[in-house]
Amino acid sequence: MKKIVFLSLSPETWDGLETLWDNATADPENEVTVIPIPTYKRNSDDSLSDAHYTLSGYPDNVPITDVNAYSLKANHPDIIYTQNVQDTSNPGFCVHPAFHTDALKACTDQLVYVPYMCTEEISLDNKPYLDSIKMLFICPALLSNVDRIIVQSNNLKELYLYYLAGGDPGLIKHWSGKISCDDYPRNEILKKYDRLTVYRPDEWDTLLCPDSDGHRKVVLLCTSVMGILTNEHHVINKLRELFEDFMNNTDDHVLIWRPYPAIKEAIKNLRPGLVDDYDNLISFYLDNHVGILDELPSPTSAIIISDEYIGDECGVMELYKATGKPVSRLDYGV
């Protein structure tokens, strides 16, 4: 009997583990446990917010175990999957110390890191640039405690190898066997479902399944935190213009707009002058029934249902590229 534990940061990041869980539970010889773990926001004075912890919001077919009901030390699982390795190195976020990688490493034979965030494909030719962003990918805990890493693409695998091994043939051989990209869950889940089987709220069907024959083109529009912080009112103006265009083309197109969930909090803290305009934009979209406002925890449904992507360069765009469907970056005219 092999014991396998999945440590989930939240229901919103479960799609970053789901297909690995599917594979593990398919073997009756495996004892599989899913444990949501407490997370905290780190304030500017280095104090921590109250813990964020929930057992709800996960798929109905996934049994959830309370963090206090399972001892990693006593059970010593064969494999632990974690979505976080920045034990103390993230200035804005952390997990409970019991789930830092050094503690996890002492409780398992194999600690596997599955990064949730997707990043744009990065050219490996610009070494100074690669060195300048190294801290976004590599931290001491990763080097010391992680046995295996699952990344989104071969490009990211090569990036990790550059950071971890440099040009050392021995280290390249050592790390190559520890980094995989053909089983990255956020890519694999896009193959697991199709338009008919992927979850979507009932209210989406009003627009997605009209009382007419023929398929209307479904366009996914994503707005990122960085996009709005960088381009500010240009984003508001461009989106308003785009919404008006879609209002005039509802017979042929359906728009799914997915603003990144943290946008409101980000502009409140960093661009307070945009808050009212952003709220008005949301109201305009909803009041005029422009399209679907995607507030689901994961972008998986919108990616699978839609025919085309337009919007910001972000993790959703990178996932969309893996589908082979058309992708366009939205130009804010700045």
Residue ranges, per PLM feature:
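Active-site and donor-binding regions of nucleotide-sugar-utilizing enzymes
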Residues: 5-189
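A generic structural motif
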Residues: 27-33, 250-255, 291
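Nucleotide-activated donor-dependent transferases that construct or modify glycoconjugates
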Residues: 1-11, 220-224
